[in-house]
Amino acid sequence: MSIPNSPDYQLEQSIASLFSAVTGVNVYTTTRTGARTFPYIAISARPIRQLVTPYSGVYEMEVAVNYSDSSAKVSSSTFDTTYLDIFASLYGTGQSLQFEIQDNSTDIHVYMARISSQTPTIQIAKRAWNKGLVISAIVTPDPTGDGQAELDFSQYLNSQYLAVI
């Protein structure tokens, strides 16, 4: 589960806000607990690694965006049409994905974002259509967006001491 001020939480919230224009679909992030009702979009961000750069706090993130709907109630063509609406909302204003995410976020700076893969499947056991995509992003939790992470000296075990000394 993500911490509210962590880069993965902020990235999930920013991407979730992009889907507000898609009607009739529930949007869930990893911080949402409980049952999910069809149709839904599940968003899950996780850090892959911290990039070695002159500045500390730059992360490579992977965001899984999965769309699911009941195959008993929805035809495959309707499912695909809704998925295309979801896909189009990632590029709603005609900007690149990086700027779309950045425009909906205040606490992270997005250096790069791209769709790295898509996974179409149908789950027979649950009688659900499921289609997803993976977004790769490079972000820093810097609210000023100048590329330098803020140093917090309140904890003596802060790993950023090494970069400063």
Regions found by a protein language model. Name each.
Residues 1-25, 46-165:
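Charged, amphipathic alpha-helical segments and their flanking helix caps
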Residues 37-47:
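A short, hydrophobic beta-strand-centered structural micro-motif
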Residues 27-36:
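Short acidic low-complexity segments
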